[in-house]
Design a protein with these regions (language model features):
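Conserved C-terminal helix/tail region of periplasmic/extracytoplasmic solute-binding proteins
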Residues: 324-349
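Short, low-complexity disordered leader/linker segments with a strong preference
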Residues: 1-33, 348-349
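Extracytoplasmic ligand-binding site segments that recognize negatively charged/polar headgroups
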Residues: 39-46, 82-83, 87-223
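Mature extracytoplasmic/periplasmic domains
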Residues: 257, 261, 266-326
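Early extracytoplasmic/lumenal segment of secretory-pathway proteins
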Residues: 26-95
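Periplasmic-binding protein-like
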Residues: 135, 199-204, 243-267
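A ligand-binding cleft/hinge motif common to bilobed small-molecule-binding domains
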Residues: 92-95, 223, 229-246
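Paired acidic/hydrophobic, glycine-rich loop segments that form the ligand-binding mouth/hinge
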Residues: 84-87, 211, 228-233, 249
């Protein structure tokens, strides 16, 4: 009997020791990290990011996916502590910062930050989160349907494209980039020459079938032949080309207007240490490489080398240094006025 009791005690001790080891290996077991993120590529994000991070830490990830604009509203209305991390475009980071929704973070904990391109380390200032991918604005068109060859933003004004193109709404992630592109096409300057820029947009209106807020819907319009060309960010080209390999990507002659998608901690996060670990994980070599191989995001790590096939759709290599990046403080200050004038221009066909 004594031997049986001793054996049971030994087994209990072994189980408790195993539990202690597991707890030490996964110190975040039982914690839930709530992320506000994009709605697309959910399966690939689960495979490349969420599942490996949960396996590594023992935490549970809840990913709330929606468009940038919808998420800004949700975050503004959320109670403190409802969210931990926001993954969103640069223009919307500025809006959230102005509303006090973005917390600073301890960049000394980001062990992968040194491998990131300098202009992606702290785009919104020291103490705020890094970019995890670049993007650039271009034109996707179907040469089988399009009556002209397109090489520039200025080509979109060609009368042969009447009611045949899509452009981003000014409130879309790429909207301000297109505004800058229009200005460059005609030798104008945002802020200084707004009257002239909107006059050019009014001239473009007969060609515009859609001012979109959803890139996916715009690609559907391309596929159905409702439009022959669309102004899109580069990552949308991967989706478009998978539907029709004939689609052509154009780096506009006016230049590479671009920006970032970024990672930040939400003010009031109950899991800030875990949130910072997640942001660092997002910058890791294996994760960035996997995302690039799957055509999800271009890497911000300078040490990742892509073959021609995987690099062709991304803002990669020398292009990173060629990006024309808007002053987002300036854009944020002017966006309400631009939006009002945009709606006046495009609300009635």
């Amino acid at each position: 009997m004594k031997k049986l009791v001793s054996l049971c005690l030994a087994l209990l001790l072994l189980v408790s020791l195993c539990g202690a080891v597991l707890a030490e290996d996964k110190p975040y077991a039982g914690q839930t990290l709530t992320i506000s993120t994009f709605a697309f590529n959910a399966e690939l994000l689960q495979k490349n990011i969420y599942d490996p991070f949960m396996e590594m830490t023992g935490c549970t990830i809840v990913a709330d996916g929606a468009s940038n604009a919808v998420r800004v509203t949700k975050l503004a209305e959320a109670a403190e502590g409802d969210y931990d991390v926001v993954i969103i475009g640069d223009m919307f980071v500025k809006q959230l910062m102005a509303e006090g929704k973005i917390d600073t973070l301890d960049t000394s904990k980001l062990t992968n930050l040194d491998a990131v391109y300098d202009n992606a380390k702290a785009p919104m200032g020291e103490g705020y989160g890094p970019a995890y991918t670049f993007n650039r604005l271009g034109i996707v068109y179907n040469p089988e349907d399009c009556p002209i060859e397109i090489t520039s933003f200025a080509d979109l004004w060609d009368p042969e494209l009447r009611d045949y193109i899509a452009i981003p709404a000014i409130t879309n992630t790429s909207g301000p980039l297109f505004y800058y592109g229009v200005a460059a096409a005609f030798g104008l300057e945002p802020g200084k020459d707004d009257d002239a820029i909107f006059a050019k947009l009014a001239e473009l209106k007969p060609n515009v079938k859609s001012t979109y807020t959803s890139a996916n819907n715009t690609i559907t319009m391309l596929n159905q032949g409702e439009i022959c060309a669309a102004v899109l960010l580069d990552y949308s080209y991967t989706t478009a080309k998978s539907a029709n390999p004939a689609y052509v990507w154009v780096n506009p002659a006016e230049g590479l207007f671009g920006g970032y998608n970024m990672l930040n901690v939400i003010t009031g996060s109950k899991n800030k240490e875990l949130a910072e670990l997640f942001i660092d994980f997002y910058l890791s070599f294996d994760l960035q490489y996997a995302e690039a191989m799957d055509g999800v995001d271009c890497p911000v790590r300078a040490d990742i080398v892509l073959d021609e096939e995987h690099a062709q759709n991304f803002t990669y290599g020398e292009m990173v240094n060629q990006l024309i990046l808007p002053d987002w403080d300036f854009v944020t200050a002017n966006l309400p006025g631009w939006t009002e004038r945009w709606n006046e221009t495009f609300s009635v066909k």
